[in-house]
Design a protein with these regions (language model features):
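Conserved ABC transporter NBD signature motif
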Residues: 5-16, 25
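Conserved ABC ATPase "signature" region
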Residues: 62-81
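Conserved ABC ATPase signature
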Residues: 85-89, 93
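ABC ATPase C-loop
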Residues: 102-103
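Catalytic Walker B motif of ABC-type/P-loop ATPase nucleotide-binding domains
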Residues: 110-113
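Short loop immediately C-terminal to the Walker-B catalytic DE motif
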Residues: 116-117
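ABC-family nucleotide-binding domains
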Residues: 120
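H-loop/switch region of ABC-family ATPase nucleotide-binding domains
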Residues: 146-147
Length: 170
């Protein structure tokens, strides 16, 4: 992650970004890649979610982790695919799995690159509703990258447009 302001200071949780150790920053940040298949690390969908839960909640028993993973898969409409390889899912299902896996953690900042691309209206609303809930209940900051201007208008507190070599407030 390399962000250097032309002037001024970038602060994350009140600290100058240049003075934050990378490891500390990465522990507070969750990322969903534009191509979600690039972030999967396990052999099946259930294990993918369990891995994320365990990473952030290592005090839970195996049974608790399994139950929580099954509950979350059900919420996202992915329960019937629990034994599938993540790579066997459709692009939209992979995207939901990636978002689900990231939300399993205790991050304070989420960077989501096109999390609703390829989703139908219902799935888009479900993902965005879940994000809104996490923002309200956990105080998350979300940086959402999208080409969907209507989505950005509907959900964002602040919007910026990247054009040419500049970043402009929308």
């Amino acid at each position: 992650l390399k962000i250097n302001p032309y002037e001024g200071v970038i602060k994350v949780f009140g600290k100058d970004l240049k003075k934050i150790k990378k490891k500390e920053l990465y522990r507070t940040m969750g990322i969903v890649f534009q191509n979600p298949a690039n972030q999967f690390i396990t052999q099946n969908v259930l294990d993918e979610v369990k891995q994320s839960i365990r990473l952030w909640n290592n005090k839970l028993s195996d049974e608790e982790v399994n139950n929580e993973a099954l509950k979350r898969l059900d919420e996202y409409g992915l329960l019937r695919y629990k034994r599938y390889s993540p790579y066997m899912l459709s692009q939209g299902q992979q995207r939901r799995l990636a978002v689900l896996s990231v939300l399993a953690g205790e991050q304070k900042i989420l960077l989501l690159d096109e999390p609703t691309y390829g989703q139908d209206y219902r799935s888009t609303c479900a993902i965005m509703s879940l994000l809104e809930d996490k923002i309200k209940t956990k105080g998350l900051s979300v940086i959402l990258i999208t080409h969907d201007e209507e989505l950005a208008k509907s959900y964002a507190d602040k919007r910026y447009v990247v054009r040419g070599n500049g970043v402009y407030e929308a």
